[in-house]
Amino acid sequence: MAFVRNLLLVVVVVASIAVWVVLPWPGALLLAVLLAAWLLLTRRGRQAGSVAGVGISTLRQRLGSSAVIVVGIAGVVGVLVALLAMAEGYSETLRKTGSRDTGIVMRGASASEVMSGLDHDSVVLIAQAAGIARDAKGEPLASPELVVAANLPLKNGGPDDEGSVQLRGVGEQAWAVRPQIKLIDGRRFQPGLRELVVGRGAARQFAGLVPGREVRLGNQKWMVAGVFASGDAMESEIWGDANVVADTYGRGSSRASVTVRLADPQAFGAFKTALEANPQLKVDVSTTLDYFSKQSERMTKVIRIIGITVGVIMAIGAMFGALNTMFAAVAARAREIATLRAIGFSGLPVVVAVMLETMLLALAGGLIGGVLAWLLFNGYGASTLAAGTVGQLSFQLHVTPELLWTGLKWALAIGFIGGLFPAVRAARLPVTTALREL
């Protein structure tokens, strides 16, 4: 019989955690309101509140053991939120890079620009497709581009410390295709010359990317002409004239992709249909929003898996700390609990009281961990090798309200498990045995 009760208890725990994980904050608020109503309006609820009040009033006497729960859970929440904020910041940076009124065309079955290649004839045909916006001279707003890897010395690094940056060769219409890109220092590069404009993120990460300075790329000296800002992944790149980049790196007349500005977002369908129906072309067509969102998925998933794995490992430690602390608290209050049972308190108020005490400590730990994660990591700059590129992507960690809520749910879940088993043990404690032993 005891085995069946314990098995049912485990099932209840698993089911409760499964529901809690997917519960939105309005659902949690509703549960809190229902619990408060039960505590205030029912006899057993008032009994549970009385017992919980006694336990909470003794927390000062158990400050050390209580701090173990709070600090442990705060650590879990802080680390979890920080790692998930990294995934959120990475994903957000790539999502902001694209839009629905720009399209990108690559060779068919290419997963990214790095793996794509378009010959000169294909590039010419793509620029003539329907749906592309045109400038005042009637020229299509299409930028044939290629990407190559370049190594540059890192800022604040040793003499031999280098990092990979993505060098993008762009066409003359690149600025019109991406109007969000603004020069913040210097000027644009001159077509036909070995000149560069560098993203703000790349300038922060690599040494020598200052207007007027020379850097060596592909065994050639290049002059840095300016610095641009865009608020997206492009800030991690450096740009040069596509023809010059192709000559320097032996790419001939081929290009990795063609990025176009559409006449309007609704024109994408006609643009894609025209290219896919052309028997001379074998290409993949997507909006830049879809392309960069897809590029972010794999790395975002990896970072989230790492964050959750680390969080689970730390949560197990915090949970055992909570179990140990609450079992000790129940043992120390065995006579008090037995006396309450003897004068008519049922088992349910005792269970709820112990659970409330543990959940209160867990809530405090979750709030502390969430606040620390927001203060320390929100907006913190980081960089990593971006999926589908050959360079580092600079981004900022983003601690969102959703991530803070996720951390708080983890904290309360740890408190729930850490308090439930000691609470059930307290409720099952035989009254006569407890009074006789103590």
PLM feature segments, named:
Residues 2-17, 90, 264-320, 329-331, ...:
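Peri-transmembrane interface segments
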Residues 320, 327, 332-381, 406-414, ...:
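Transmembrane alpha-helical interface segments in multi-pass membrane proteins
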Residues 63-90, 300-336, 359-368, 417:
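Hydrophobic alpha-helical transmembrane segments of multi-pass inner-membrane transport and secretion
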Residues 6-31, 367-409, 420, 424, ...:
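Short helix-loop junctions at transmembrane helix boundaries
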Residues 74-166, 187, 192, 273, ...:
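Hydrophobic, regular-secondary-structure patches
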Residues 161-205:
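Short beta-strand boundary microenvironments
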Residues 134, 153-163, 204-307:
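Mechanotransmission and gating elements of multispan inner-membrane complexes involved in transport
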Residues 1-11, 36-77:
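N-terminal Sec/SRP start-transfer signal
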